[in-house]
From Swiss-Prot:
PANTHER family, per database record: BIS(5'-NUCLEOSYL)-TETRAPHOSPHATASE, SYMMETRICAL (PTHR35795:SF1), SLR1885 PROTEIN (PTHR35795)
Claim: Hydrolase is one of the keywords in the record: yes
Top-rank lineage group of the source organism: Bacteria
InterPro entries for the chain: dGTPase (IPR006261), Diverse_Catalytic_Enzymes (IPR051094), dNTPase_2 (IPR023023), HD/PDEase_dom (IPR003607), HD_domain (IPR006674), PHydrolase_assoc_dom (IPR026875)
Name of the protein in question: Deoxyguanosinetriphosphate triphosphohydrolase-like protein
Keyword check for Membrane: no
Residues in HD domain copies: 80-197
Length: 349
């Protein structure tokens, strides 16, 4: 008997009813999109969201956006794109083990860093200093996905995906810090922490800025002595603690206190030795200088931006239009513009 197209999506939704725990998010129970659409014949709503993000221009640009080390340092360092893929992989592993919606996790993970600026967090710091209302990449990710992509139409993603992206950032468990309303969104937040702390250590060791022996022994004894062991420890702990939470009626993703403290301390070590350390300061300052100059140039010459961003200037103001243009740039494109604007091309007599 042939299976009609409509039943293909229904088959997936039927499987979700069996495989996803009651506390998880089933596709058929979505809170919907800002603009209502007809359902896809084959894919669930979260599969559609995942595919829209993957096929977006903003997603493709992540391959040329720095994670920590600018690509001129070598070919094997993580980019914002490879970081995103690692977050998705870790998140799906955690989600599958708990019994959550893997498609929702994947969509949130793939979109979580869409709003990041060129040159990693140095770029974010520049825009945060220059813009009257500050700048946060998670909020910008939502703006890119809802107001910038598809020439201003946005991708019209589900509320679950947008909420997970908005709340993925931060390293705090304070009660006043809001969290994603789905467990899937909370999984991505933890997966992001697990991924970036560990792969930044791996890249720093590859760059010769750290050695395994430099890592605090008390933390390594808790988390593991190498990259794969640490990820294994953190993933298993997140799964077990979350299942324990659910069993006790606390519907939230988490880690055991011992493991989470160790992860936070390892992140603190990375801030002191790498992210804010003296070794990379010169490179950070160069990146910031480039962004400052390009931003200020377009503040004075907004008429030289593409028409799309000039329209934003007219509708939402000069700073917003320039910020949208700058925040979408890859490292390569930002450097190209800097050279075109400020570096002479011919000898002047």
């Amino acid at each position: 008997m042939s299976i009609d197209k409509m039943s293909l999506r229904k088959r997936v939704e039927n499987i979700e009813r069996i495989s996803i725990i009651p506390e998880g998010t089933k596709s058929e129970d979505t809170k919907g999109r800002i603009i209502k659409e007809n359902q896809d014949d084959i894919r669930t709503v979260f599969m559609v969201d995942r595919d829209r993000i993957i096929h977006s221009k903003s997603f493709r640009r992540l391959k040329h956006k720095t994670q920590v080390y600018i690509k001129t340092w070598g070919d094997h360092y993580r980019t914002r794109l490879t970081h995103t893929l690692e977050v998705a992989q870790i998140g799906k592993t955690i989600g599958k083990s708990i019994g959550l919606n893997e498609d929702l996790i994947e969509a949130i993970a793939l979109g979580h860093d869409i709003g990041h600026v060129a040159f990693a967090h140095s770029g974010e710091e520049v825009l945060n200093e220059l813009l009257p209302n500050g700048f946060k990449h998670n909020i910008n990710s939502i703006r890119v996905l809802t107001k910038i992509e598809k020439q201003g139409k946005g991708l019209n993603l589900t509320k679950e995906v947008l909420d997970g992206i908005l709340h993925h950032s931060g390293f705090s468990n304070k009660k006043d810090i809001t969290k994603a309303f789905t467990l899937e969104g909370q999984v991505v937040k933890y997966s992001d922490k697990i991924a970036y702390v560990n792969h930044d250590i791996d890249d720093s060791i590859r760059a010769g800025l750290l050695h395994e022996s430099d890592l605090p022994k008390d933390l390594i004894n808790v988390l593991g002595r190498n990259h794969s062991d640490r990820i294994d420890t953190l993933v298993k702990d997140c799964i077990n603690k979350t299942l324990e939470n659910i069993k006790l009626g606390t519907i939230e993703v988490g880690m055991s206190e011992k493991i989470e403290i160790a992860l936070k301390e390892l992140r603190k070590f990375m801030f002191q030795r790498v992210y804010k350390g003296s070794i990379l300061k010169e490179e950070r300052d160069k990146a910031k200088f480039v962004l400052y100059q390009v931003f200020n140039y377009y503040l004075k010459n907004s008429n030289k931006m593409p028409e799309f961003y000039k329209n934003i200037v007219e509708q939402e103001g000069l700073y917003q239009g320039v910020a949208d243009y700058i925040s979408g740039m890859s490292d390569d494109y930002c450097l190209l513009l800097f050279n075109n604007i400020y570096v002479p091309k011919i000898v002047i007599y």
